[in-house]
Amino acid sequence: MSFFAILYMLATYFLGSISSAILICRLVGLPDPRQSGSGNPGATNVLRIGGRWAALAVLIFDILKGMIPVWCGYYLGLTPFELGMVALSACLGHIFPIYFKFRGGKGVATAFGAIAPISWGIAGAMLGTWGIIFLLSGYSSLSAVIAALVTPFYVWWIRPEFTFPVALVCCLLVYRHHENIQRLWRGQEDKVWAKFKKKEDSQGE
C-alpha cells in the first residue's frame, strides 16, 4: 500500500467522521438523534424522530461521504485493495467519528455510497435486496444485515478483485448491527413505521 493511499485513507476517515444526522438535527431544531428514538445518529432514526426532509438530507450526505472519496481514489489510480480500504475508512469514520466521541451511526448509507463507484450493478443489487426485505418485514435493521451478508457474493460475481475489501466493510456493518440482531431475535425491534402508526392512532382518539 502506498504512502499516498494511507494519507488518503486518513483524510477519508476524517470526512466520514462528519455526522450529518447530529449537525442537521441541530440546524433544524430536532432532538439529538443519539438521545432520541433508537439512539442511532443515522437517516432512519432522524425519520423516526419526525424529520422527513432532514432524514433525506442526512441520507444524501452520508451516501456522498462514502461515494466521493472512492470515486476520486479510482481516478487517482488507487488499486482495488486501496479503494476498498478507502471505503472501509469512510465507514469507520461514520461509525466511530472522532468529532463526536466515536459514537456514530450504523454505516449502511455510507457503505452503499462507497460501493456504488465500484459497480452500479452491485449498488443496484444491494439496494434491491435492502428494499425487498424492508417491504416484506418493515425492519430497516434486518434489511441492512441481509444486504450486507449477500453483497460480497454480488461483488465476487461482478467485480471479484474487490471481494475482500468489500467483505470487510460488510462484516463491519453486521457487527455494528449486533444489538439490532439481538432485539430481532427477542422480537423487540421496532419497525420503521411503528412510530407513525402510533402517532396516527393517538390523533384518532
Swiss-Prot record:
Probably interacts with PlsX. It is found in: Cell inner membrane. Its EC number is 2.3.1.275. This is Glycerol-3-phosphate acyltransferase. SMART domains: G3P_acyltransf. It is an enzyme of class 2 (transferase). HAMAP family: PlsY. It is a multi-pass membrane protein. Belongs to the PlsY family. Catalyzes the transfer of an acyl group from acyl-phosphate (acyl-PO(4)) to glycerol-3-phosphate (G3P) to form lysophosphatidic acid (LPA). This enzyme utilizes acyl-phosphate as fatty acyl donor, but not acyl-CoA or acyl-ACP. It holds the Pfam family G3P_acyltransf. InterPro entries: G3P_acylTferase_PlsY. Keywords: Cell inner membrane, Cell membrane, Lipid biosynthesis, Lipid metabolism, Membrane, Phospholipid biosynthesis, Phospholipid metabolism, Transferase, Transmembrane, Transmembrane helix. It catalyses: an acyl phosphate + sn-glycerol 3-phosphate = a 1-acyl-sn-glycero-3-phosphate + phosphate. The chain crosses the membrane at residues 4-24, 53-73, 80-100, 115-135, 153-175. One of its GO terms (cellular component) is plasma membrane. It comes from the Bacteria. It comes from Mannheimia succiniciproducens (strain KCTC 0769BP / MBEL55E). Its main location: membrane. GO terms for molecular function: acyl-phosphate glycerol-3-phosphate acyltransferase activity. GO terms for biological process: phospholipid biosynthetic process. Pathway: Lipid metabolism; phospholipid metabolism.
